[in-house]
UniProtKB/Swiss-Prot annotation:
Its main location: cytoplasm. PANTHER family: HISTIDINE BIOSYNTHESIS BIFUNCTIONAL PROTEIN (PTHR42945), HISTIDINE BIOSYNTHESIS BIFUNCTIONAL PROTEIN HISIE (PTHR42945:SF9). Its EC number is 3.6.1.31. The keyword Amino-acid biosynthesis applies. InterPro entries: HisE, PRib-ATP_PPHydrolase-like. HAMAP family: HisE. Keywords: Amino-acid biosynthesis, ATP-binding, Cytoplasm, Histidine biosynthesis, Hydrolase, Nucleotide-binding. Belongs to the PRA-PH family. SUPFAM superfamilies: all-alpha NTP pyrophosphatases. This is Phosphoribosyl-ATP pyrophosphatase.
Length: 107
């Protein structure tokens, strides 16, 4: 099992985003801004879906890696930390979806 984590990815993206010598794809993507980074994220999401629908397991793995990378870039530009997302996931999974829905105000 891999020891690589999403926290590792977050750190690597942050490090590479600040490279100024023209060698970093991450830095060039960050320099193009959130619209371009979000576009790339969307493209990778679609490619992941296509691989999944096609039953292409290797494609799903490869495209998922691209998807997670581009998501980390979007988070970096937006100033969103992985920890923020994990806390939101924890909050959402603390109760079942039906219990959460029932707890919403009526009306």
């Amino acid at each position: 099992m891999s020891q690589f984590t999403l926290a590792d990815l977050e750190r690597i993206v942050a490090e590479r985003a600040s490279v100024t010598d023209g060698t970093s794809y991450t830095a060039s993507l960050v320099a193009k801004g959130q619209p371009k980074a979000a576009q790339k994220l969307g493209e990778e999401a679609v490619e992941t879906v296509i691989a999944a629908v096609s039953g292409d397991r290797a494609g799903v793995v490869s495209e998922s890696a691209d998807l997670l990378y581009h998501l980390a870039v979007v988070w970096n530009i937006a100033g969103v930390a992985l920890e923020d997302v994990l806390q939101e996931l924890q909050r959402r999974t603390a109760q079942t979806g039906l219990a959460e829905k029932a707890s919403r105000p009526k009306g």
